[in-house]
Amino acid sequence: MIVKTDEELQALKEIGYICAKVRDTMKEATKPGVTTRELDHIAKDLFEEHGAISAPIHDENFPGQTCISVNEEVAHGIPGKRVIREGDLVNIDVSALKNGYYADTGISFVVGKSDQPLKQKVCDVATMAFENAMKKVKPGTKLSNIGKAVHATARQNDLTVIKNLTGHGVGQSLHEAPNHVMNYFDPKDKTLLKEGQVIAVEPFISTHATFVTEGKNEWAFETKDKSYVAQIEHTVIVTKDGPLLTTKIDD
């Protein structure tokens, strides 16, 4: 989507704020003893309060308001009976629509303290990779510069990127052009970023793996070697002044 009017911009900011509020409220509630289904109910209540609709349910008939992935799960984890434990690596991915406009955001974090420092490391490096990618977001620059920055950050920290999970265009649907915002450099991709373009940027940083495979059900993705993976995602509008993150709530 290319934002052309202030009405479109405000609508994107509104759904971005709603998704960010859901994400942050769920993260705050992620404590040892809570189930992923209980966390998902928080999203249901907040979506209803703000007049928004879960995109996974609306677009994909997904069996949950949000995707909650724990430890060996990388993405598209189904909320259910799973109990959160101290030291778990958790990813919460929230996407929704309101009045025909979408936002998509995600965060990975460690619950409490873990005796496995690599869990926190992949989270920290995912954040670093996202921040470095944002330095490349300007009209007229190559889309592939985002992936180059993400991959470089991973390598500098002796980590890898997941190559078959990518960002994407977003705005008037959950997935639209550009179909892929890679987390590595693709020299064949000559796509240029445009003023007002809306994209979801989501680095997936791993301890060892470079690909995910289907997991325990038809939705969840896992790595074959059970590598830890962390994701950070925001909905980003390309502007001449730099990236505008609709899913970031200012402190």
Curated annotation (Swiss-Prot):
Residue positions binding a divalent metal cation 2: D104, H168, E202, E233
Source organism (scientific name): Staphylococcus epidermidis (strain ATCC 12228 / FDA PCI 1200)
Swiss-Prot/TrEMBL keywords: Aminopeptidase, Hydrolase, Metal-binding, Protease
Name of the featured protein: Methionine aminopeptidase
The protein's enzyme class: hydrolase
A Pfam family that the UniProt record links to this protein: Peptidase_M24
Family of this protein: Belongs to the peptidase M24A family. Methionine aminopeptidase type 1 subfamily.
Transmembrane stretches, start-end: none
A molecular-function term among this protein's GO annotations: initiator methionyl aminopeptidase activity
GO biological process: proteolysis
Binding residue positions for substrate: H76, H175
GN (gene name): map
Function, as annotated: Removes the N-terminal methionine from nascent proteins. The N-terminal methionine is often cleaved when the second residue in the primary sequence is small and uncharged (Met-Ala-, Cys, Gly, Pro, Ser, Thr, or Val). Requires deformylation of the N(alpha)-formylated initiator methionine before it can be hydrolyzed.
Subunit structure, interactors included: Monomer.
Enzyme Commission number(s) from the entry: 3.4.11.18
Reaction(s) this enzyme catalyzes, per UniProt: Release of N-terminal amino acids, preferentially methionine, from peptides and arylamides
